[in-house]
Design a protein with these regions (language model features):
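N-terminal secretory signal peptides and thylakoid transit peptides that target proteins
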Residues: 8-25
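N-terminal signal peptide c-region/cleavage motif recognized by signal peptidases
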Residues: 31-33
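Short, glycine-/small- and polar/acidic-enriched structural segments
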Residues: 37-178, 189-195, 211-212
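Helix N-cap/coil-helix junction residues
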Residues: 107, 164, 277, 327-328
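Pocket-lining segment of extracytoplasmic ligand-binding domains
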Residues: 178-276
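Secondary-structure end/capping motifs
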Residues: 234-324
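Conserved C-terminal helix/tail region of periplasmic/extracytoplasmic solute-binding proteins
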Residues: 311-348
Length: 348
């Protein structure tokens, strides 16, 4: 509330805010209850190029669970987090940075599956002819990226590591489709993004740094994951166990036959359809990621290690950095409260 409002208006406005918040919470609770009774789920996904898009296309999750599954495409991790918080979706895909921010803000979610270890699948690209050849050259220039995303986090990390004050760079909050439009118009000098947008900007740009290089240099790694609303998870244990098995089988099928995932294959055609990528670029895009097998995810290094796990430590480091930047106001003492290995530990 603005301090210019008169004090006598505050009780009424505060009560209205409380009532509105209560109504929103009740609506989300009722929505969750309705989903529980009807065996329905809404899954928010993004445009990451990952193997399980083929399972989305074939309806594999529906076949194995008997649930009605609705997929809702969202434009950024921040949108996914807001949808989880409101109850509009029960499960969502996002990067480690949005989930770190969500947990720091008290959103009741649990990370339960690592979609990918990002490695070189996200990159900072400068436009050809921009005169940008190093991170130092970004001073005073415009970078387009989605705020509170893994690329936002790594852009800030990379700039600081290079001795560049992020405030000396114009960082614009753009979702991938908006990045492509701004790139085509010449409104931005650089972008930090993932495929399919990454493949398109590479055609007229130069890679300055990848997430894998930044992680190797700074020790701050990033990943994409799936998280579930805690209230939904309590009521749908068997569904989540089968969902994780679908995810594991999708990754295994790709890893065992990478050569078969050609541009003309039904698998790659499905990935292209669900993400908006060009089929010809999908095989190379998939190769940039590392897909972590369920046995490794279940172990102490990833989801199963409690506070000392890679996931909890990465979430904590990301949240601490976001707090320094003013993106979040507080950090949790232990981010393993937002990590649940139970379902991946039962996967085969």
């Amino acid at each position: 509330m603005s301090p210019s409002f008169r004090s006598q208006a505050r009780p009424t406005r505060q009560r209205r805010s409380v009532l509105q918040a209560g109504a929103a919470l009740l609506a989300a609770t009722l929505a969750g209850g309705a989903a529980a009774q009807a065996r329905e789920v809404v899954i928010g996904y993004q445009d990451m190029v990952v193997p399980w898009r083929y399972a989305q296309e074939t309806g594999e999750l529906e076949k194995r669970t008997g649930y009605k599954v609705t997929y809702r495409k969202l434009g950024s991790g921040a949108e996914v987090v807001r949808a989880l918080a409101s109850g509009a979706i029960q499960i969502g895909e996002a990067g480690s940075s949005p989930f770190a921010a969500a947990l720091s803000q008290g959103v009741p979610i649990e990370v339960f599956w690592i979609l990918d270890d990002i490695h070189d699948a996200e990159a900072l690209v400068a436009r050809n002819g921009s005169g940008i050849g190093t991170l130092a050259d970004l001073k005073g220039r415009k970078i387009g990226l989605p705020f509170v995303s893994t690329t936002h986090f790594h852009a800030l990390v990379a700039l600081q590591d290079a001795g560049v004050d992020p405030r000396a760079v114009q960082i614009l909050n753009l979702r991938p489709p908006e990045i492509l439009a701004a790139w085509e118009r010449g409104d931005i000098d650089a972008t930090f993004v993932w495929d399919p947008a990454l493949a398109k900007v590479k055609q007229s740009g130069r890679v300055i740094a990848t997430s894998g290089q930044i992680a190797a240099r700074t020790g701050k790694a990033t990943f994409d994951a799936l998280a579930v609303s805690k209230s939904f998870a309590r009521e749908h244990d068997a569904f989540l166990a089968r969902f994780v098995q679908v995810l594991a089988d999708a990754d295994r099928a790709y890893t065992a036959d990478k050569g078969g995932w050609t541009a003309a294959s039904p698998q790659v055609q499905a990935v292209a359809k669900w993400t908006g990528a060009e089929a010809a670029s999908v095989p190379a895009s998939l190769a940039l990621y590392a897909f972590v097998p369920p046995a490794e995810q279940a172990g102490p290094r990833w989801l199963g290690g409690g506070k000392a796990s890679v996931v909890a430590q990465s979430l904590a480091a990301t949240a601490a950095f976001l707090k320094e930047q003013g993106t979040v106001h507080s950090v949790l003492p232990d981010y393993s409260v937002g990590v649940n290995p139970a379902w991946v530990q039962r996967a085969q």
